[in-house]
Amino acid sequence: MLKDPFQRLNLDREVLTVSQLNGRARLLLEDVFAQVWVEGEISNLARPASGHVYFTLKDRNAQVRCALFRQNAARVRQALRDGLAVRVRGKVSLFEGRGDYQLILDMLEPAGDGALRLAFEALKEKLAAEGLFSAERKAALPAHPRRIGIVSSPTGAVIRDIISVFRRRAPQVELTLIPTAVQGREATGQIVRALQLADAQGFDALILARGGGSLEDLWCFNEEAVARAVDACVTPIVCAVGHETDVSIADFVADVRAPTPSAAAELLAPSSADLQQRLNGLQQRLVLRMRDRLHRDAMRLDGLTRRLRHPGERLQQQAQRIDDLEQRLLRALDRRLCSGQERLARLETRLAAQHPGRTLNLLRQRLDHLSSRLPRAMQANIKGRRQQLQGLAQTLNVVSPLATLSRGYSILLDDRGQAIRSASQTQPGQRLKARLGDGELDVRVEDNHLQPVTLPLL
């Protein structure tokens, strides 16, 4: 390690080039400031395509250039931006080409308020994405509240300022303090419980208030638990945390944000002068509306009066109308009577045409005609049937077995009356009957002889 970069330099006898000077200076800076921690605020942030990050780190009185090369920049989890307070670690070096000295960084982290600001922005984005800041969730403040709950510290100027405003502007309003810590480790839990208790009391409105302080002092109002407790309140709530320039997460979630606790009280405590002015305005509006209404009613009455006619004229018109209706009624009756007479005449004509006497005469004539035709038809029918019967009898005689028997043939019958068709159906000694054309004979079989029979050819 070079203990004294200038120990061999004789300024009276040796002249250095610019490059030599910058090189000696770089070695000196890197040797003495090999690793340092520096805290400041980012400005002039640049991100070229190479992946390196360049910015200026500054405080109120001075600034220094910083370089965060790609391999180290990849390890930084925070979103870098101008104005972010950070704490960096690195070595002091010198860029020989320009003679600028700079910090070559190997670590970067949020510093102080910078870390809190990152947490603030992260929670703000989360709750905004859930819709907790949307206007649709905001409740309107009551115009004339009677009971107001105040969630704040029981000591300090805040509660005194709020009470003073109400005494001056609206002494009739009942104020109730729900005490809570507004700073420190226990503040978050106490504020949440105080809000829940106040919301259950049925107040017309709530005030969540605290005086000014640093970001760390006001941090409990940026906790997610407090923000969700404010959002859960059914009672309209005004949030007044810190000074006018201080903005908390609770301010975004509340129904109304007031820049100061006194301003919150004034929002809920309209002054007597304001009320009197509003009353005067309402009175003037009422008088104007009454005058306008009376004027319109008077004009309407005049119009009705002009349209109103004398009763005698109305009676005369009604009498004329009655006469007209009477004439119309008489004409209608005459038309109805004539129409009825014409219809009656048509019905009489139809009735005469359909008289039963005429129908009976026609039926009687038809009966006489049919009576004269009946004997002839019966004789013709009987004659035809007789001829048909004779033809059938002749046909029957031709095919009758009796005709065959009359020609010398006979039929043998057994004791059951069944015809014997073959000699094989008989037995010697069997008694049979022989039916002839004119009678029957009892015969006995002496013997049966089967003989072949030659059938005639067709």
UniProtKB/Swiss-Prot annotation:
Domain of life: Bacteria
Catalytic activity annotation: Exonucleolytic cleavage in either 5'- to 3'- or 3'- to 5'-direction to yield nucleoside 5'-phosphates
Entries under Gene3D superfamilies matching the protein: 2.40.50.1010
Presence of the UniProt keyword Nuclease in the record: yes
GO biological process annotation, one example: DNA catabolic process
GO cellular component assignments: cytoplasm; exodeoxyribonuclease VII complex
E.C. number(s) listed in UniProt: 3.1.11.6
Chief place of localization: cytoplasm
UniProt entry keywords in alphabetical sequence: Cytoplasm, Exonuclease, Hydrolase, Nuclease
Subcellular location: Cytoplasm
Gene Ontology MF annotations: exodeoxyribonuclease VII activity; nucleic acid binding
Coiled-coil parts of chain: none
Record-linked CDD domains: ExoVII_LU_OBF
Job description of the protein: Bidirectionally degrades single-stranded DNA into large acid-insoluble oligonucleotides, which are then degraded further into small acid-soluble oligonucleotides.
HAMAP family given in the database record: Exonuc_7_L (MF_00378)
Family: Belongs to the XseA family.
Quaternary structure annotation from Swiss-Prot or TrEMBL: Heterooligomer composed of large and small subunits.
Protein name: Exodeoxyribonuclease 7 large subunit
